[in-house]
Structure formats: structure tokens, C-alpha cells
Amino acid sequence: GNFHEALNLASLWKLPVVYIIENNLYGMSVPLSCSTCTPAIATRGAAYNIPFDIVDGMDVLAVRAAVAKAIEHARSGAGPYLLEFQTYRWYGHSRSDPRAYRTKEEEADWKARDPIPNFAALLVAEGVATEEEIDAIEAKVKGEIQVATDFALSSSLPPAEELELYVYAPSSWTDADVAREKALRERVRNGGPGVKKARYWEALRDAMREEMLRDPQVFLMGEDIGLYGGAYGATRGLFEEFGKERVRDTPISEATIGGSAVGAAMCGMRPVAEIMYVDFTPLAMDQVANQGAKNRYMFGGKTKVPMVIRTEGGAGRGIAAHHSQSLEALWTHFPGIYVVMPSTPYDAKGLLKAAIRDDNPVMFIEH
């Protein structure tokens, strides 16, 4: 699934990622023994050449040492590291969870290993802190939690007028820009001197090339976009010009393509990710629709996700049941993402350049 795709890509690209698994022994109610065929989850890292450690998550010093080791590894350029902390979930999955799937004796055994009082006792025993200092720290933390709780409970609900306030990042286009674009469109449609003729894929390639030259944060990623030049030739020559760091071939892993694009965009880059057919975009539904499209809204407008998913759909050539659907309407149901489906080379180039510069996720469907 997505976890395996992510591990594979991180190891393949030697990304400085530390993956942390908090193994609390249960899903919602199903125990690990009934849902996972191995006693530990971190062993999956071996399949992707990722070093891993399985750590007692109730031991503060063991956790600290493991994290320090993993971070040093990632920062050295050696690639990702996988940590599994074996811990416990004190409470049920939700307020309505009666915890009937485990015994009180099991809960008591794990409660005896509670790292907070145990570590505090260790600090006192080793002479690192006094009981008074521990009590002061505990009181300070409880006070901070109480302040946050009081703030949440006393805050009024946002007014209905703000319902759509943070759905989309604001556009930088002015009325003058729109008027100029309208005049230019008419001149191009009428043809004549100075109007370049280009095929659809050439217009797309020119748009990406120009934006990559203009902004070093723009990069391409996706299936067969490198030396092959893309399934329909739209990235032809860009690998040779910009190199493998900015034109990145990926495995056939649509979920990870979408998720990586969301993450890169949140960190200030402007990814242009290619998913070969719109039929395959539902494989990235969680990453693009649940994370990318909702991110700005959920964080009160404090983030932006400037990313483009390029894909192919619509009529033209019938390529069987799994490669020929028209799913543009599906993506229009998600607030926070723009859907673009240009019909002419002129529209394709202009809209792709605008999509790359926009601070919102864009599903860009070509034909």
C-alpha cells in the first residue's frame, strides 16, 4: 500500500526521512497479531534497503538515543531510517470505545510502565532533579494545557461568512491581466504574423521549460518523464536540459507521486507531477483530495500547496476500459482544487503556466 510505496521512493532517492511507527498494539480494536503477519512492523524496512530499529517506546532514554542515531543517519546523506516504538494506547479509540477487546490486567501491566512517572523517578534517583523540581515541571505543563483548553472552550464558533474564506489561496491576477489575456487570445485565434503554430504537446513542453527557467523551485516528477520524454512526448528534451534532480522519473506509484507533490509544495517548491492517465488519479485520491486540497482550509489560510497534477483524459484514442475514462467531473467535487481541461495548444500553454504559478493544487487534464 501507500506505506510501501513511500518507503520505496524514499530509499530510491535517498531522502533524509526518519519514519516513526508508534506501535500501540491495536488498530481500532483489532490487535496487531490479527492484522499483521510479523511481530514487528519495522522489519518491512529491510525490503527497501532501509535500516531500522525496534525500540521500547516506554523508555525515554532509549527513544532519545534511537532518534539521535536515525537523524544522524538521515543527515549524512545515507537515506531514510525506520523506527518502531512499541508503546500502548491508554484509552479507547474514541469516547464511545468500551475497550472490551482487552483485559484490565493488560492495561494495568502497561500502566506500570508509564514513562512519565518512571522517568521522573529515575531523574530523582540519579540526582539529576529533585522531587520539588519535578512537581514544578508537572504543574507548569498542566498550566499550559489548562490555558489551551480554556482558550478552545471559550472561543466562539467562526461565523458563517468565513465558511469559504480559506478554501483557495487568493489569485495574483488583476483586471488588467485578464483584459490583456483576452486581447491576446483574439489575436492568436485570428492567426497572422508573429503567431507561432505548435502542437499540443509542444505547447505543454514549452510551458514547463519556460517556468523551470523562470523559477528554480519548479520541478517535474512522474512516470516515464525522463529520458523517455513522457508517454505523449510533453517532457521531451527537458531531462537533458535540466537533469535528473529537476526531472524525476518515479515508480508506477500514483499515491506516492501525489503525496510527494503535496509535501514538496508545502515546503515551498512547485512540483509538476505527471500521472499517465486520469483513470489512475483515484489511486492518489487521499493524498490530493484529503491532504492537498484541504490543507490551506484546515490550517486557517496559513499554508499553501502550489502543485500541478498533469494527466491525460478525454476522447481521441480508445485505450480500453482502464485508460479512457473522463473523470474530470469527479475532481470538481473537491473544494480547494482547481480542475483545468484545455482544448487548444494556446490554452494548454497559458493555463499550464498559470497553474504552475498558482498557489493552489491544480488537476490539469490534457488530451
Kindly give the residue locations of the regions a language model identified.
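Glycine-rich ThDP/TPP pyrophosphate-binding loop and its adjacent helix/strand module
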Residues: 1-147, 151-154, 332-367
